[in-house]
Amino acid sequence: MSENIAVVGSGAFGTALAAVIALAGRSAVTLVGRDPSLIADLKAERLHDAVLPGILLPDTLEFSAEADAITGASIVLFAMPSQAQADAARQYGPYLCKDAVVVTCAKGIERATGNLLTDMLERELPDHSIAVLSGPGFAADIAKGLPTAMAIAAADMETAERLAQAISGRTFRLYASNDRIGVQLGGALKNVLAIACGIVEGRGIGDSARAALIARGLAEMSRFVVAKGGQADTVRGLSGLGDLVLTATSHQSRNLRFGIALGRGEKTDPLQGALVEGAFAASVASRLAAELKVSMPITDAVSAIIDGKLDISEAIEQLMTRPITTE
C-alpha cells in the first residue's frame, strides 16, 4: 500500500529517515524543516553536509519549509528532539489530515511533566493515533544504507504493522509492537546508561565495569518499564538491549561522548548538555523511580553527577558498596 509520508525535522535523523523511506520507492516522501534557506539548499544540492557529510539524498525526496506541506500525509514522523515535540505538535497539528498517524522518533521523556512522548502528543493531538519509532540506529548508518533494524510501536498491532510496512526498506527493517511504553522507555533510559558508560570510559575504569553497567542497567530498565505498565520482553529487544549496546559502545553516540567528557573531568558546554537526551532523562527518570519505589541506583548516580550533587569517585564507591543481593 502506497502512503504519503512527511518527516518533520531536518536534522541528521529526520533527513536520514526521509532518505531511506524515499529510496524504498513505495511512498511519496517530503522532508519538512523550519529553515527556508536550509531547505532551499537541500533541494538544490541534494546534500546535507552539516549533519550527513557526503551522503547524496535521493531525487525522489521532496523538501518544504511550509507547515502545510504535511496536509496530505497519512503518516507524519516527528524527528525533532524530545523537548521540542510539544511545540511541534502545536505548530503542525492544524495541518494534519483527519486520519494521519503521528510517529514520534525522539528518545526522551517530557521534562516538565515526566510524561512519555506518546502521552504528551495524545494530549496535544487528541484526534490522532500516536506511534513511536525507536531502536539501535544512527543517522549516518541509516542514510548510508547500512543494514539497520528498529522497532515501531502503536496502540494496536494493526497500526504498528501498517507503519512497519510503509517505512521499512531494503536496508531499513522495522519490527512492529503494541508496547509503546516499553519501546519509549528503552529509548529514553538507554541514553542515561550510555552517559554512565561514557563516564566509565572517561575515567579509564575498564571494560569489565562497562559490561557490568550494561547488564545492571538493563535490569534497572526492566524494573522501571514493568512498573510503568510496559512489557519486560520489550526491554530485551531492539528498543532496549539493542539500543543500549549500540549507544553504550559507539563513539557516534552523543550521550556516550558527553559521559566521557564528564569522566575525564572536562568542563562540559551547557549547550552540549542541552542537546544530550540522556541529560534530560536522568533527572526525570530518577524522580519517577522514587515515586514508583523502583530501585535505579545507576540512573540516580548519573542524575546526581550531572546536577553536580555527587562526585564521580563517590558515585562509584556508593555503587560498589551497596548491600550484596541476588541478581
From Swiss-Prot:
Extract the InterPro entries matched here: 6-PGluconate_DH-like_C_sf (IPR008927), 6PGD_dom2 (IPR013328), G3P_DH_NAD-dep (IPR006168), G3P_DH_NAD-dep_C (IPR006109), G3P_DH_NAD-dep_N (IPR011128), NAD(P)-bd_dom_sf (IPR036291)
Q: Which GO terms describe its molecular function?
A: glycerol-3-phosphate dehydrogenase [NAD(P)+] activity; NAD binding
Chief localization class? cytoplasm
Q: Where in the cell is it found?
A: Cytoplasm
A biological-process GO annotation: carbohydrate metabolic process
Entry-linked NCBIfam families: PRK00094.1-2, PRK00094.1-4
Protein name in UniProt: Glycerol-3-phosphate dehydrogenase [NAD(P)+]
Q: Which organism is it from?
A: Rhizobium johnstonii (strain DSM 114642 / LMG 32736 / 3841) (Rhizobium leguminosarum bv. viciae)
Q: What is the lineage of its organism?
A: Bacteria, Pseudomonadati, Pseudomonadota, Alphaproteobacteria, Hyphomicrobiales
